[in-house]
């Protein structure tokens, strides 16, 4: 069984502004996210939201001018440039209202990376592929296209099966 973990820390910071007002910020960084054989299956059911996440990530990475090729997997909503990982995280937050690390959309991008790199081992597929010196912006867009096409095709097949 394949098991990948992101070691992490959950940091909670509280700031008292006045005796009646309290502001709390929670920062999750490198939170442990296990994977399993089930999550690594390439035939997971897909949803319209999966397709929208991939389409939105591609929109976020509209040009090479907004691509951050030095990913750290720390994403800030105020950023002006986005790595592959951060574009997917931002898209997930916009579409779902939350980030789901092992969501089918993100897994499909990981699978596209594996296929494009002929199974090269990465500790963090999205970050490491993004940061490879040989990776070009066009490669990032192609990875998103492959994942989008796969999800779109599976969604169409699922919807076809539902018809009477």
PLM features: residue spans?
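Positively charged n-region of N-terminal signal peptides that target proteins for export
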Residues: 1-7
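N-terminal low-complexity, Pro/Thr/Ser-rich intrinsically disordered segments
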Residues: 31-54
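Bacterial N-terminal signal peptides
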Residues: 8-19
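N-terminal regions of proteins, emphasizing targeting and processing segments when present
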Residues: 13, 27-30, 113, 117
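Signal peptide processing junction and immediate N-terminal pro/mature segment
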Residues: 20-32
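Compact alpha-helical subdomains of small soluble proteins
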Residues: 90-164
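Short N-proximal segments of mature Sec-exported proteins
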Residues: 49-112
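Acidic/histidine-rich, surface-exposed loop or edge segments in extracytoplasmic proteins
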Residues: 34-41, 89, 122-125
């Amino acid at each position: 069984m394949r098991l990948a973990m992101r070691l992490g820390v959950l940091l909670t910071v509280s700031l008292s502004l006045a005796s009646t007002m309290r502001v709390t910020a929670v920062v999750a960084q490198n939170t442990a996210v296990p994977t399993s054989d089930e999550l690594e299956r390439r035939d997971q059911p897909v949803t319209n939201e999966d397709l929208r996440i991939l389409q939105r990530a591609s929109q976020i990475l509209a040009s090479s001018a907004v691509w951050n090729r030095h990913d750290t997997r720390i994403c800030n909503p105020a950023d002006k440039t986005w790595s592959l990982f951060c574009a997917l995280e931002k898209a997930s937050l916009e579409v779902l209202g939350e980030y789901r690390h092992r969501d089918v959309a993100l897994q499909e991008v990981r699978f596209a990376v594996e296929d494009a790199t002929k199974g090269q081992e990465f500790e963090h597929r999205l970050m490491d592929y993004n940061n490879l010196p040989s990776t070009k912006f066009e490669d990032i867009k192609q990875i998103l296209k492959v994942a989008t096409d796969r999800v779109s095709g599976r969604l169409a097949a699922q919807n076809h099966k539902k018809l009477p």
